[in-house]
Each structure stands twice: as structure tokens, then as C-alpha cells.
Amino acid sequence: MSSILPFTPPVVKRLLGWKKSASGSSGAGGGGEQNGQEEKWCEKAVKSLVKKLKKTGQLDELEKAITTQNRNTKCVTIPSNCSEIWGLSTPNTIEQWDTSGLYSYPDQTRSLDGRLQVSHRKGLPHVIYCRLWRWPDLHSHHELRAIETCEYAFNLKKDEVCVNPYHYQRVETPVLPPVLVPRHTEILTELPPLDDYTNSIPENTNFPTGIEPPNNYIPETPPPGYISEDGEASDQQMNQSMDTGSPAELSPSTLSPVNHGMDLQPVTYSEPAFWCSIAYYELNQRVGETFHASQPSLTVDGFTDPSNSERFCLGLLSNVNRNATVEMTRRHIGRGVRLYYIGGEVFAECLSDSAIFVQSPNCNQRYGWHPATVCKIPPGCNLKIFNNQEFAALLAQSVNQGFEAVYQLTRMCTIRMSFVKGWGAEYRRQTVTSTPCWIELHLNGPLQWLDKVLTQMGSPSVRCSSMS
């Protein structure tokens, strides 16, 4: 390998001297072959950046920012259309559609453009250099937010993107206000069964590459088949243009019960040790043990690592009832899907060469779709599939409506996701249990919060039984 890196310029050595190790200190980490490969990769990444910045005269500004650790330094930019510079193929774009028509979001097609490739490893340039010089444990661009003075921040989608690591900050998880729950609430005389969309025929949606709708997109009325039982819920960007309130734009504190004279008890949210649990299915059969996710970033893939806390490897799992269709589908899972839990939000990114299909009631609520809508995520694209703050607002609102309304929210805490093969109205397979390979996520934090709220509210006056 020494022939590949015959000479390291002094400026590269200086910049590498400020590289943060996993322990948070500057300089190189420990030994070992893996660390040696990582060091060589970091050197290549820095060399590549230095070469570009020398051409634009920004190298001194980068070195100043890193050595002074000062956010008041200037932007340090490289071209954002790195798909051409680095020989990457044009990333997939996604269109949103359903049985009633086509909806296009052209403004969102660049959200995953500009990935940088260094020695067969791809990543967004500002993430690579923030990880190198500030946060070694950084997983995704979702964890970063640009400072207000950054003129070429990644989220601005300009022709140049700033890679000054001190122009970005880590996203902090927002503190959710407690939900005020009356100790005794008037309960419906009978608790209807929980809505189950497993066997319903969902609509299908292809979602834009970006995880947010454009600012100017406000659906006047949902398309046919997209009537949400909870009403339209819009993202924060959409709410800025709306006159009437929706659950997503109201904070939990504004939706707390207003029953005067009642004994209101605050029920707080707390993060569990495992933020989600994942079960794997082949057709209608559960396969293997439940995977409990403790890391903020994890992948569900088709490979065979048995002991990595950041990977749920489906390739290891055996099933005596596995048929040829399932076997063929498993071969195409590949790198699968990456799940992020960052800042109270859950994202799904398709790493596979084949699309993944997601049914997320929380996401569907946000865009005013039917709760059973299935969203297709092509390779290289990502989607926000859950938001704690939106859920908190809905929970606080539902407390006013009684035990049954709160109980119905449990369906929002379950997300189904199939690999390679989709299901729904536009597919031969009508239900998720007809797809060869799929997973079910249970979001433990929201589920435990619901449990505490329901416990505080008390049981329904008439319990469900075989006779009710």
C-alpha cells in the first residue's frame, strides 16, 4: 500500500493531526489492520480535499477553521454536483403517485446528490469532513444542522456546498413536554377493536427523494381514497402556509386537556434502552429472533454478520418452509435499508439495488394520506417515517377524546417494510403478508409512553371479551 501513497504533503499531515479519534481526542487512533486502513482512507480524503481547495485558494481558510475551531470563519466550498466530479451515476429520483393521478416534486430531486467517493466509499462531503475533524461517531447528514451564518450549507442546495466542519452543529433531540392526563376520564362504554390495516388494500405512493414536501405544496383536498381518519396532518413547512391548525403544528402543551377541576397528572416521555424492535417475516411466517436496536443508526441487510449491534443480518436466518420466490428475493436484499433515529425522528434510506416499500401511519398522517398507504423508496433515496413531536401532539390531542382515541395511536408505532417486492392496490400482492421478505418495526419509546398514558387514564368501563 505504500506505493499508493508515496508522499504526504506537509499541509495534509498538519490537517490529519487535527483528526478526531473515537475517544474524542485529536490525532490517530489505536492500532490494528482495520485502523490502518481507516487511516489511509482518511489521508486520501484529506488529500482529495486539499487538491480541490488549492485550486480555489480556500486551503488557508480551512486550516484556520480547524486549528482555531472557530465558527466565525468563512465558508469552505467545493462543487455540490459531485455526481459528475466523482464519477457517480445520477441518483434516483422519486415521484409521488397513487391510483387517482400523478404528483411531481421536482424541487426535491437533489436531496441525496453530491455524494463523494473516496477509495470505493461514498458519503456526503460535509458529513465526511465533520466526522473526520469533529465527530467520529457521526452517521448521517440528518444529525447535522448548519449554523445560520453559513452561506453554502448543504440544505440550501446551492451549486457549492460548505465543508467547513465548524459551520455545522449536531442536532439535539428535542425535549417533549409531558402530556397532562386526567386521573379519571369519561370512558366510552365499549372499546372498539384496534384498527388493523394488515389485510386492507393500501394505496401506493412513490415519494420524492427529499424527506420534506416543498414549501409551496399544500393539498387542497386529499385525492380519492386518501381520507385520513385523523384529519390532515401537515409538516411544519406546510403548516406555515395554512390558516387552520392541525395536530402536527400544535405543540403538546397547547393540546393538553382543559377539563377544569380535574386531577391532571403529567406523563413524561423517556428514551428506552432499545429505541426499536425489529421482527423479520417471510410471507406470513415469523423467522428468527427479534432484533433490539440500541444504536442510533443500523442496517437491515441480507448478509451474515452475527454479532454487530448496528446490523440485523437476514442472511443468517434459516426457514425450512422457504420457497423459491423467497430465496430469490433474499438474494436481492443486498445492503438492504439503513434506519436512523436522530433528534426524535426516524429515517429510512434504501441502500439496496432494489426498492423498499414502507407503510408508516405517522408518515401518511403527515401528508394527509390514508393510514394504509405504502410508499416506494428507490435505491439511494430516503424518507422520514416517524416524528416524535408529531406523535406527541396527536397523543396530547387524543387524551381529550378518551381512552379509545389514545389506544388507537398504538397503530402509529408500528412500521412495516418489504424488500424488493411491493404490495397494495397497484401490485399483485395485496397484503404485506403476501410479500416474500418483510420486517415490522415497533417503536418502543412511543409505545411505552402510550402505555403510561393509558395506565394513568384507567381501563375502559366495559372490557373487551369474547362476549362483547
Curated annotation (Swiss-Prot):
> Which segments constitute the MH2 domain?
275-468
List membrane-spanning regions: none
Q: What is its main location?
A: cytoplasm
Annotated Gene Ontology cellular component terms: chromatin; cytoplasm; heteromeric SMAD protein complex; nucleus; transcription regulator complex
| Location of the protein in the cell | Cytoplasm; Nucleus
GO MF term (any one): I-SMAD binding
The keyword Magnesium is assigned to this record? no
Domain of life (superkingdom)? Eukaryota
Q: Which residues form the MH1 domain?
A: 10-177
Q: Which InterPro entries match?
A: Dwarfin, MAD_homology1_Dwarfin-type, MAD_homology_MH1, SMAD-like_dom_sf, SMAD_dom_Dwarfin-type, SMAD_FHA_dom_sf, SMAD_MH1_sf
Q: Which SMART domains match?
A: DWA, DWB
Which of this chain's residues are annotated to bind Zn(2+)?
Answer: 75, 150, 162, 167
The residues the entry assigns to the signal sequence are none
**Alphabetic keyword roster:** Cytoplasm, Developmental protein, DNA-binding, Metal-binding, Nucleus, Transcription, Transcription regulation, Zinc
Q: Name one GO biological process term.
A: transforming growth factor beta receptor signaling pathway
Name the residue ranges with Polar residues bias.
234-244
Q: What does this protein do?
A: Promotes differentiation of dorsal tissues. May be involved in the mediation of Ndr2 signaling during mesoderm and axis formation during embryogenesis.
Q: What is this protein called?
A: Mothers against decapentaplegic homolog 2
Which organism is this protein's natural source? Danio rerio
